[in-house]
């Protein structure tokens, strides 16, 4: 019961657990979904996805409907016979999903930056901050997932087969690529937001100086 309930908690962190009494294993990983509450700019949050494995059963548990699970379920080559293969396939697909969303975020960042070159406003800076917030969520989730990948085959319910080696290698590469890309985009965004925030602040200071001078001129006796 806990294995089903835990992934439904939005605050649940990525982890692996094995229940000796039932023989079931629980893998909780973080999945990116579009932040539907933010209509100003494309942004993401992450939610827990639970994978329950054991006794010939594989089950996924998630608190929200999402594009990832729908697309994954449509795949014709899903292998449920080998639990290790299924776990690796779903983790690899999630890593690919992060990389795809990172490309979307980068396109959004480039578009906002183009707008900023024409007119520096708080609105555009807030949009960049939303993109930056998405990257913070991504990095925390990807590092948590990386820990899960390293612990995956320590579970008694998941046996490692020779055929899994290539898939595991692909998974590690995809997840590491997502981590490195996220860190790179974070550094770029920090530099951009800092530069434009400074320019906006300077513009405001110049405006205030002009207004002050204008006020002084108005108060001078004629």
Predicted segments, located by residue:
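Helix-boundary and N-terminal cytosolic regulatory elements
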Residues: 1-78, 108, 144, 148-160
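Short C-terminal domain-edge/linker segments immediately following a structured domain
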Residues: 11-14, 57-63, 82-84, 89-95, ...
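Generic detector of short alpha-helix boundary/capping microenvironments
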Residues: 15-16, 44, 48, 93, ...
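Membrane-associated alpha-helical segments
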Residues: 56, 107, 111-115, 120-222
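A short, charged helix-loop
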Residues: 66-85, 110-119, 125
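A short, ordered amphipathic alpha-helix with a cationic face
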Residues: 77, 100-103, 139
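Long, non-coiled-coil amphipathic alpha-helical linker/lever segments
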Residues: 77-94, 98, 160-167, 171
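Well-ordered alpha/beta subsegment
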Residues: 85-109, 121, 128
């Amino acid at each position: 019961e806990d294995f089903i309930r835990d992934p439904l908690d939005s605050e649940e962190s990525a982890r692996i657990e094995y229940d000796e009494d039932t023989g079931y294993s629980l893998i909780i990983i973080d999945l990116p979904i579009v932040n539907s509450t933010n209509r100003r700019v494309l942004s993401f949050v992450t939610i827990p996805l639970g994978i329950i494995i054991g006794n010939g059963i594989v089950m996924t548990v998630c608190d929200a409907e999402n594009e990832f699970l729908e697309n994954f379920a449509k795949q014709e080559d899903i292998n449920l016979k080998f639990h290790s293969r299924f776990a690796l396939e779903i983790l690899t697909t999630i890593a690919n999903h992060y990389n795809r969303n990172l490309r979307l975020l980068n396109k959004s960042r480039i578009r906002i930056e183009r707008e900023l070159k024409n007119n520096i406003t708080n609105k555009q800076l807030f949009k960049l901050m939303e993109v930056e917030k998405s990257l913070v969520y991504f990095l925390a989730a990807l590092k948590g997932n990386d820990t899960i990948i390293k612990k995956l085959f320590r579970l008694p319910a998941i046996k490692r087969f020779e055929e899994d080696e290539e898939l595991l290698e692909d998974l590690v590469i995809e997840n590491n690529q997502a981590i490195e890309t996220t860190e790179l985009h974070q550094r770029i965004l920090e530099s951009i937001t800092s530069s434009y925030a400074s320019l906006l602040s300077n513009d405001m200071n110049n405006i205030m100086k002009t207004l002050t001078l204008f006020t002084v001129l108005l108060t001078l006796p004629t």
